Amino acid sequence: MLTFIGLGLYDERSISIAGRDALQAADYVAAEFYTSYLVDATVSDLETAHDIDIDVRDREGVEQHPEDILRKAQSEDVAFLTAGDTMISTTHTDLRLRAIDRGIDTRVIHGVTAQTAASGLTGLQNYRFGKSVTLPFPYAHGAEGVPTSVTDSIAANRERGLHTVVYLDIKANRDEYLRASDAAEMLATDLEDMLAIAVARAGSPDPTVRADRLSALAEKDFGDPLHLLVLPGELHHLEEEALAALADAPADMLNAVDSQ
């Protein structure tokens, strides 16, 4: 059996009860934290809290050389962990399909994701979001500015009146995390100076949610990572009220969105 378990967003307690039970019953536990990580828990914290040993895999060890994971899963109960949800954004469908091809039973125990948390924290309605994008560090995509794939997706969403979640690049092996202020500065240069919402530490006891024009967000300090940005499309009146109450959105910026 190969069980995919989402750990949620914040610490060793963010996992669901079903996930915790499956984790503690596993004979072997593997995890990856190269695409996301828990804001307030180390691997050691997870191991201590759940009385387990975790084999942390790099990207190559998951995507190119998962044979030992699959071999173990043919005769043992194996758990595979990620922050958030293993099948949303950080998708491991390929690993699941490889297991199924070998006749291995699989299941998924879901965790809270950054996108659902961002919707809840901002008050923006979940069904009004379009395609999400990831904004890389400039050095990571080998060119100046924002990749056209990012700006094109944002523009396409806005044409349809949809909101965009902008995930921010993570280089966990280098302890580098793109911050909302730096991302806002990059986007303000390549896009119009539009309304945006910075969300920091979603899932924690002290998340930060602030709405303003991109140039204003670029001047703010949102504290420790992880951060993301939301670029709103057309706003329902309840969404406007939520952004004003939950994210201190300036009234003139909400009016500007209405007039687009």
From Swiss-Prot:
Gene3D superfamilies: Cobalt-precorrin-4 Transmethylase, Domain 1, Methyltransferase, Cobalt-precorrin-4 Transmethylase, Domain 2. Pfam families: TP_methylase. CDD domains: DHP5_DphB (cd11647). The keyword Hydrolase does not apply. Pathway: Protein modification; peptidyl-diphthamide biosynthesis. It is an enzyme of class 2 (transferase). It comes from Haloquadratum walsbyi (strain DSM 16790 / HBSQ001). S-adenosyl-L-methionine-dependent methyltransferase that catalyzes the trimethylation of the amino group of the modified target histidine residue in translation elongation factor 2 (EF-2), to form an intermediate called diphthine. The three successive methylation reactions represent the second step of diphthamide biosynthesis. Keywords: Methyltransferase, S-adenosyl-L-methionine, Transferase. HAMAP family: Diphthine_synth. One of its GO terms (biological process) is methylation. Belongs to the diphthine synthase family. InterPro entries: 4pyrrol_Mease, 4pyrrol_Methylase_sf, 4pyrrole_Mease_sub1, 4pyrrole_Mease_sub2, Dphthn_synthase. It catalyses: 2-[(3S)-amino-3-carboxypropyl]-L-histidyl-[translation elongation factor 2] + 3 S-adenosyl-L-methionine = diphthine-[translation elongation factor 2] + 3 S-adenosyl-L-homocysteine + 3 H(+). The keyword S-adenosyl-L-methionine applies. S-adenosyl-L-methionine binds at L9, D85, I88, T113, A114, L168, A202, H227. Its EC number is 2.1.1.98. The gene is dphB. Homodimer. The lineage of its organism: Archaea, Methanobacteriati, Methanobacteriota, Stenosarchaea group, Halobacteria. GO terms for molecular function: diphthine synthase activity. This is Diphthine synthase. It comes from the Archaea. Coiled coil: none annotated. PANTHER family: DIPHTHINE METHYL ESTER SYNTHASE, DIPHTHINE SYNTHASE.
